[in-house]
């Protein structure tokens, strides 16, 4: 039942997306963007007024779906739909399915992304300080909160896939319609981007680097192609609420393109609203902000050329295409001659990666392990777009290399999850996804895609819920000994649990009704 509710919610957001429609042509990327924005806006508004209840979420979605239908119905399609992105559709499922069919396993997702979302749902409000990171810019976690409120924690991996799909379809659309890339080249470019390891590994997590990259790319797209479109306002505002550096990237985009004052106002108001929220709660809530080296020491640039060399080595090993896309962004002002603003925005994003905190190390090595490559996601995304024009000159060779890169990226993900036999079905399911896209286009059966998507959500949620205890217990196993704490929580379902040095997200998955609280570092037992 929970899988069905998750499918209804996610497909419902897709159906309600035209409520935000602002252009005559409304492709897959546009619908994905607006669906994700609605998925953030519903819990954001309800949570601000202490109404974050399942019934309120469903009522809001129903009203928006009706509005979307009324706005969309009178419009006559200007063409027979978009050409299916066969490579992109298959690649998305190939890298995401091994993660979708499992409960959340990513460390950051379980440490603070999910605990934030769960705490809001449990409090029915955004006005809480039960977690260390309650102050964190909330956009992607709000999307997770909506799904957590109405459905199942085992459906949460789909939150990451939506952002990854938006990035892929926007790169394909931008390359094809605006930059003149041949259809297969545009498809292959998008597929190679979303299968690059730093991005693909977030395809079914609650991490927000791909979210930031996707919405920053959307902001750049509309600033570059239709600077008066109202979609810019929403994209810039949402970007400002993604990670602490979201507003910096928004400012880079708006500054390089000399955006209109209303766009600046929207991004500033969104951030100001959340800062006001934090200011009002700051006195009563502890906050975990940073641990490890100082700000400057945590950056890559502080460690000079050896650190930059390490970045090049680690990125090349993880994904050659990711390195190529990043370098394209870094040299954007030289590569992009027709839209100088786009080139400078890309270059600034690449430079920001080297000077932002956590790029080199925190309490643990970030760069040497490749963990910090995810912070370069915005630069990689726009760098992929910048590669479209040069790739046109050698279209056949470029397409072949991009397909090879796509297969390499899929192989990296498969290698990570291969020991679990269920991973082996990911490739056949990816082929089915491409087949569904082809059938829907050939027979003009547009209803086929949401039905297939709903079926996939139900199936993946069921598979993820089969034996979560095995995954989580193994994470604490020492030799042949495994503690029984997670099994006790799953069976006893206590009313509340205070945690210190533990990933509260595991408890949020195993016992959604259990209220979880991050205990302070000092006097934890007394506080509990």
Identify the residue ranges that each predicted region occupies.
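Perimembrane helix-loop-helix junctions
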Residues: 71-76, 225, 249-270, 336
């Amino acid at each position: 039942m929970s899988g069905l509710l998750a499918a209804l919610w996610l497909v419902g957001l897709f159906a309600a997306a035209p409520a935000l429609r602002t252009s005559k042509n409304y492709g897959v990327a546009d619908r994905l963007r607006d669906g994700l924005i609605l998925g953030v806006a519903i819990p954001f508004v309800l949570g601000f007024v202490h109404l974050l209840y399942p019934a309120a979420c469903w009522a809001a979605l129903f009203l928006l779906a009706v509005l979307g239908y009324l706005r969309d119905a009178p419009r006559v399609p200007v063409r027979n739909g978009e050409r299916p992105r066969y490579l992109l559709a298959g690649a998305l499922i190939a890298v995401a399915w091994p993660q979708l069919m499992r409960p959340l396993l990513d460390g950051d997702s379980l440490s603070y992304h999910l605990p934030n979302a769960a705490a809001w749902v449990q409090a029915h409000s955004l006005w809480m300080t039960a977690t260390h990171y309650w102050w964190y810019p909330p956009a992607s976690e709000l999307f997770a909160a909506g799904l957590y409120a109405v459905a199942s924690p085992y459906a949460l991996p789909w939150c990451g896939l939506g952002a990854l799909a938006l990035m892929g379809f926007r790169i394909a659309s931008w390359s094809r319609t605006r930059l003149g890339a041949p259809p297969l080249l545009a498809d292959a470019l998008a597929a190679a981007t979303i299968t690059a390891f730093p991005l693909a590994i977030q395809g079914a997590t609650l991490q927000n680097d791909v979210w930031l990259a996707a919405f920053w790319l959307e902001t750049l797209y509309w600033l570059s192609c239709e600077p008066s479109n109202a979609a810019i306002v929403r994209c810039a505002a949402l970007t400002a609420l993604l990670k602490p550096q979201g507003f910096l990237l928004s400012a880079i985009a708006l500054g390089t393109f000399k955006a209109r004052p209303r766009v600046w106002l929207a991004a500033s108001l969104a951030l100001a609203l959340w800062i006001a929220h934090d200011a009002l709660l700051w006195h009563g809530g502890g906050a975990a902000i940073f641990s490890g080296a100082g700000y400057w020491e945590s950056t890559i640039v502080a460690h000079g050329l050896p650190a930059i060399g390490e970045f090049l080595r680690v990125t090349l090993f993880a994904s050659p295409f990711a390195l190529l896309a990043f370098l394209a962004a870094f040299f954007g002002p030289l590569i992009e001659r027709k839209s100088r603003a786009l080139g400078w925005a890309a270059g600034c994003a690449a430079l920001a990666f080297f000077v932002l905190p956590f790029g080199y190390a925190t309490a643990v090595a970030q760069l040497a392990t490749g963990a910090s490559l995810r912070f370069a996601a915005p630069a990689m995304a726009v760098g992929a777009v910048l590669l479209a024009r040069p790739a046109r000159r050698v279209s056949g060779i470029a397409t072949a290399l991009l397909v090879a890169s796509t297969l390499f990226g899929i192989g990296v993900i498969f290698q990570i999850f291969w020991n679990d036999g269920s991973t082996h079905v990911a490739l056949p399911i990816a082929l089915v996804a491409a087949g569904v896209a082809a059938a829907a286009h050939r027979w003009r059966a547009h209803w086929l895609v949401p039905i297939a998507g709903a079926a996939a959500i139900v199936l993946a949620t069921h598979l993820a819920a089969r034996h979560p205890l095995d995954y989580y217990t193994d994470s604490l196993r020492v030799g042949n000994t495994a503690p029984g704490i997670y099994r006790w929580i799953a069976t006893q379902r206590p009313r509340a649990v205070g945690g210190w040095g533990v990933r509260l997200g595991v408890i949020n998955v195993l016992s959604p009704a259990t209220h979880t609280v991050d205990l302070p570092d000092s006097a934890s037992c007394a506080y509990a």
